[in-house]
Amino acid sequence: MTSFTVIGHTACTDASFPLDDLPGKGGRMDLLCRAVASSLFLSHGIREDTTCDIMLLGQPHPGRIIRFDGSALRSLSPDERNIASSIKRALAIPAGKTFREAGPGLLTRKGTLADQLSEKHYAVLDESGVDIRKVATEELPDAFLLSDNRNFSDDEMELIRDIPKYSLGPAIVHADHAIVLILNEIDRRRSGWI
């Protein structure tokens, strides 16, 4: 199972955010929706071996995590509006420290980056990291951490200081594009192309 966690530094944590203003009042929720779509959707299906957790750190209740689990998802389309509607549904239910189901394959809880990092062996995508193509397949982690359009904060940098860092190439790309590149690399290796 491949997992992605994407931090949304300003993503709204109130279910009343408007679907017609995801970048503004949604707190760049559009970026998180694209990351979810890139993580889970194939041309004619869903990656059942992938999860995407989005960490919503915006107001009014920072520290909400929403998980999209490809093995159980139903009725999700790859467009931003549909994914944002699922996020709203997850935000509408009370959340505690353990995941609670908001729908098939849609889970939510309260949590921090430290909580996330304690659950899996992560790698961070960083342009100054080791070229991912130089990393042996068996050394690739099962989980990848990405940030939205903002750099990791100083506190986040301290938490990820000792985590392996990988680069996807010489150009800096958007988080959703980075997810596609990682999955393509994994697909190529699993299929014996590399």
From Swiss-Prot:
It catalyses: pseudouridine(54) in tRNA + S-adenosyl-L-methionine = N(1)-methylpseudouridine(54) in tRNA + S-adenosyl-L-homocysteine + H(+). Its EC number is 2.1.1.257. It is found in: Cytoplasm. PANTHER family: TRNA (PSEUDOURIDINE(54)-N(1))-METHYLTRANSFERASE. Disulfide bonds: none annotated. SUPFAM superfamilies: alpha/beta knot (SSF75217). Homodimer. Pfam families: Methyltrn_RNA_2. This is tRNA (pseudouridine(54)-N(1))-methyltransferase. It comes from Methanospirillum hungatei JF-1 (strain ATCC 27890 / DSM 864 / NBRC 100397 / JF-1). One of its GO terms (biological process) is tRNA methylation.
